[in-house]
Amino acid sequence: MFDIGVNLTSSQFVKDHDEVVARAYAAGVNGLLLTGTNLYESQQAQRLAQHYPHCWSTAGVHPHDSSEWRADTGEAIVALAALPEVVAIGECGLDFNRNFSTPQAQEHAFEAQLRIAAELQMPVFMHCRDAHTRFLALLDPWLDKLPGAVLHCFTGTRQEMQECLERGLYIGITGWVCDERRGLALRELLPLIPTEKLLIETDAPYLLPRDLSPKPASRRNEPAYLPHILQRIAHWRGEDPQQLAAATDANAEKLFGITLKSA
């Protein structure tokens, strides 16, 4: 099973990268996509992906960091994207929940990265929170120019999911769905996702599954907990976990153009 969303550049992992990756593989995870959220972390993610087997990375600027976008940022992302470990542009998109960067800065950076992805014919790894209508308005003109796109860590409504699926987007599901307080609505939507459009992720070190037992003392999420998330998703979808793991692996291979080792 492949984890499409690992923030291995997080300071929470700085002391034990080796152990985190080793635990993931020992747990049955067969690959990791390391997310880049700004230029520096995209460079870090690429170096980590180069260092560890069965790891790839993204290159991009998260909406929170969009105020950092400069005239030469796009050129730097293009240069990173030429490296073999980098398989997607992002994490990019819109986040109007906290507006760490202004909406205008977010939209500018998002459109610039959609343009880069289209020019390079690379998939986009996207983020959207409290910005669905504007997100789709910016994305729509590029959809027929992109080879593929995933909306990671989906936590939206039924209508929002349907509108994403109608556009052919892949949907990334995290341990958010394991939260009996916040995740119930999303849990009910799981059967609506076509198997061929589902991807799974931890978003580690964030979003530790609330129903994980025992929980780590650190309360830090890790890619080693992806099997737990997969099991729960399969249960709520009424599917066999092994078959779902194989299907989501095939989806990741198709979207990102990678080859995963057999389980």
Swiss-Prot record:
Tagged with keyword GTP-binding: no
Pfam families tied to this protein: TatD_DNase (PF01026)
SUPFAM superfamilies for the chain: Metallo-dependent hydrolases
Gene Ontology CC: one annotated term: cytoplasm
Binding positions (a divalent metal cation): E91, H127, H152
InterPro entries (alphabetical): DNase_TatD-rel_CS, Exonuc_TatD, Metal_Hydrolase, TatD-like, TatD-type_Hydrolase
Entry EC number(s): 3.1.11.-, 3.1.13.-
Required co-factors: Mg(2+)
Protein's cellular compartments: Cytoplasm
Family: Belongs to the metallo-dependent hydrolases superfamily. TatD-type hydrolase family. TatD subfamily.
Quaternary structure note: Monomer.
Full protein name: 3'-5' ssDNA/RNA exonuclease TatD
Species, as recorded: Citrobacter rodentium (strain ICC168)
The encoding gene: tatD
